[in-house]
Every structure is written in structure tokens, then in C-alpha cells.
Amino acid sequence: NNYYQNGLSSRIRDKFNSIYKSDIYPDELKAYFIPRENCVGKRSITENDNSGTIECSEKTEPTSISTIALYEYLRASLDPNCTEIESESCTNYNYFNSNLENFWTLTADKDTSYKVYKISSGSVTLSSANNTSNLKIVVNVNGDLPLESGNGSKDTPYIINYTK
């Protein structure tokens, strides 16, 4: 049960593909999606680098729908003391903790073949890959996306009008 093997070879990849192929996103909107490589390098709980170097040491083929790698969660914290995976400082001023949701990351544990990092109520935890959790969907879009209004903030999110 390797979480990552020869690309994002797992149930999570299958889920992303099924979301993309479904009618959740209309084809007119999918035209603005930009496929990107995903960083899926494994990391140990003791590694403190949050630059993306560890996770980006291995990448998938480009995909249109994905989720975040662990380093992206760590870097979202505005607390300068967020330097270790298990540090409570990483939950401070972190956009991803606004709803205290539970969700998977793309990052697997380097020391096992079956554990994956997930965010659980604002904390980083290691969980067996056969457990259930939510996905925080990430879609990259090109700069030509027709914005109706908004500034991208939590209070005034972008409103997209892809029918223009």
C-alpha cells in the first residue's frame, strides 16, 4: 500500500481523476485549469525543512486537480516559529486552520509505506492511508479567468463568471 509509487499511484489519485471527469466543474470552467506537477516526496516527522525541497524531490505527472503537500500547510502559517512539523506555532495564523477541518495532504511518511500526513483539527498527524478524511481540493487556473468581483480574501472571495 505505498501512498506514492510511480506517480501518484493511489486511491487519492483516482479520486482526483473522478472529480475532474465528473460534472462538478463544467467543461467551460475546466478550460481555465492548468495541469501542474505535484510534490509527493516522503518526509520523516523529524525533518524540519518547510521550503518544499523534501516534498518536491519527487513529482507526479501534471494533473488538473490535487491537494496540498505538507510543506504548503506549514508555509501558510504566518508564525515565524513554525519550523517543526509538530509545532503548535504552525497552527497560529494559518489560513488552512480557519475551519478546523480534517484533511489529507499529499505527503507520505518516509519511515513507513502506509502512513500519510493529514491535518486534524489544526494539528499535523500521521494516519494510516486506509483511514478516511476529507480532501482540500486545489485547482490551478490561468490568468485569463474572467473574474466577476472579489479580491481573493476570505471575506471577499473571487467570483468567477466563466460564461462571459
What residue spans do the PLM features occupy?
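Collagenous Gly-X-Y triple-helix signature in extracellular proteins
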Residues: 1-164
